[in-house]
């Protein structure tokens, strides 16, 4: 069968890589793909981003189903468009994707359905937002209401930072429409974890747990990024906590969406904060797999992803269980010079090691032109190592990272430090 993955990042490369391993899959189209998907003989890049043209392509080629990687096409309604044409697609509708595309929608939804989260208020007026922050004090969290490519959250440790974030979003309009309203919430302390499930509208199956590293620099210093590395499983999510998250957060979300007349089909990612007592609260929802969490999760997944998504699209996930490699997978992101500001493009990449049983490299910001692989975006590669312990997986990943060269490459040297400390 033919399947299609929409997107061009490391997450999409990992999804396409996993789908291509299914005996039922003849070809995986990746639209538009990247340099890594271009190099893989089992994958075929399709230089299309327009949803209407993609739908026509899927129809013409007899694509069995399409899976959407990034948030922007989901928020723009690609699922609604494909479904209206009778095409099978995995992802939430535009209305359901508001769980990610509007922070205010998500917070109001959680409050309405009793899902644990931080207290908050939403503002469109800078003066009112400044007054609220002065009343509440710091630390405090300022979030752009709309999609801001992972750059719309400021964890302000001082009042000065909080006021600066409000001005940046509401007064200076630096995030455009995404920052036309801000959600201001209480600061939650603890350890973060990513909890991702596959939903079919009624039932869910949980993906392996994971934990990512948002900050640019070692020791969780420097600015926030889209993510500099991740590992799976996340030891902070114990079996007891896993059951609690499903019971208190995931299932009430799926039931709540159904109750509100917006049934949720697709990947659902709950960003969690686990406090010192082991109590989970929801920081955010994403309507897709995380990046870079997808890369280590796919490296560990033993179940055929084609079967999982095929059943989810048909609403038949009930009773399905997933099988996982017992090893830890740890992914290190290699980013371009000057990321996360204005990353440099066009640096030649060499030395990417061949895939082995214990390491695989997923591409993100790469382009293949005239046989040369060059950088084309902020996060360039995610190098995944697999081993029996976090420490050994870390060694496997960094062993591969050290073989790869491109000018200005930057990466953290401590991915997995929280798990190793435990």
Curated annotation (Swiss-Prot):
It comes from Ralstonia nicotianae (strain ATCC BAA-1114 / GMI1000). Signal peptide: none annotated. This is Phosphoribosylamine--glycine ligase. It comes from the Bacteria. ATP binds at residues 133-194. NCBIfam families: purD. Belongs to the GARS family. PROSITE patterns: ATP_GRASP (PS50975). Its EC number is 6.3.4.13. Transmembrane segments: none annotated. Keywords: ATP-binding, Ligase, Magnesium, Manganese, Metal-binding, Nucleotide-binding, Purine biosynthesis. Pathway: Purine metabolism; IMP biosynthesis via de novo pathway; N(1)-(5-phospho-D-ribosyl)glycinamide from 5-phospho-alpha-D-ribose 1-diphosphate: step 2/2. Its cofactor is Mg(2+); Mn(2+). Mg(2+) binds at residues 284, 286. GO terms for biological process: 'de novo' IMP biosynthetic process; purine nucleobase biosynthetic process. Residues 107-314 form the ATP-grasp domain. Binds 1 Mg(2+) or Mn(2+) ion per subunit. It catalyses: 5-phospho-beta-D-ribosylamine + glycine + ATP = N(1)-(5-phospho-beta-D-ribosyl)glycinamide + ADP + phosphate + H(+).
